[in-house]
């Protein structure tokens, strides 16, 4: 299997110093809402700001397993970015208990899109799941092995060549335990675009 590299920036601040990045617990004064969901409901999501070339960027992020940060801006207009080290992000449903279901996403934006569907009930999505965010194609082997431990694995990858290749490869690996979720957002590049289209339609009524 040959996968094209995801075109995603990895920002490493000068000299390895963390002075340019600030991580805070979400508060009322911090970023409270993205796509209509209160991100403070998710303890794994933090308020993140970083400074680069005299400009400060604000948004939210989660910490991956290599202590890097998967960052998205408040308005979701830019691509997600990894600050420091790339790595898989594992978000268990419960800290001390592994679910028998796993949802795998290409990036954090699709994870937030899923949470929007879960909250607003636009369409039915699986619940009571653990979550894994791949973030970079170099993490593919890691996520494929992790999925072996679950009874059901829901695959939320983009409807592009790379996403379809990953979906098919994981489907072949997990067999009947894998559910391809990209038909849900057929006609859209990814889950985020699908959710944004639903919100536009809903708000225009």
Describe the residue ranges of each PLM region.
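Conserved hydrophobic helix-helix packing surfaces used for dimerization/oligomerization
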Residues: 23, 101-103, 153
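Surface-exposed charge patches
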Residues: 30, 112, 172
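Terminal peptide-recognition signature
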Residues: 32, 114, 155
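Phosphate-handling DNA/RNA-contact segment within nucleic-acid enzymes
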Residues: 51-146
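TOPRIM fold recognition
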Residues: 118-205
């Amino acid at each position: 299997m040959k996968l094209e590299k995801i075109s995603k920036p990895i920002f490493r601040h000068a000299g390895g110093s963390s002075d340019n990045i600030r991580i805070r617990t979400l508060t009322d004064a911090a970023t409270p809402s993205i796509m209509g969901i209160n991100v403070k409901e998710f303890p794994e999501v933090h308020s993140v700001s970083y400074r680069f070339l005299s400009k400060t960027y604000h948004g939210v992020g989660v910490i991956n397993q290599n202590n890097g940060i998967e960052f998205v801006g408040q308005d979701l207009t830019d691509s997600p970015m990894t600050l420091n080290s790339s790595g898989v992000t594992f978000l268990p449903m419960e800290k001390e208990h592994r679910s028998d279901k796993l949802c795998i996403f290409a990036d954090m934006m699709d994870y937030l899109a899923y949470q929007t569907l879960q909250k607003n009930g636009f369409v039915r999505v699986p619940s009571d799941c653990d979550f894994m965010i791949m973030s970079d194609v170099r993490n593919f082997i890691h996520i494929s092995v992790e999925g072996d431990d679950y009874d059901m694995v829901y695959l939320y990858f983009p409807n592009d060549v790379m996403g379809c290749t990953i979906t098919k490869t994981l489907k072949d690996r997990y067999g009947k335990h894998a559910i391809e979720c990209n038909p849900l957002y057929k006609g859209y590049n990814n889950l985020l675009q699908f959710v944004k289209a639903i919100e536009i339609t809903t708000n225009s009524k």
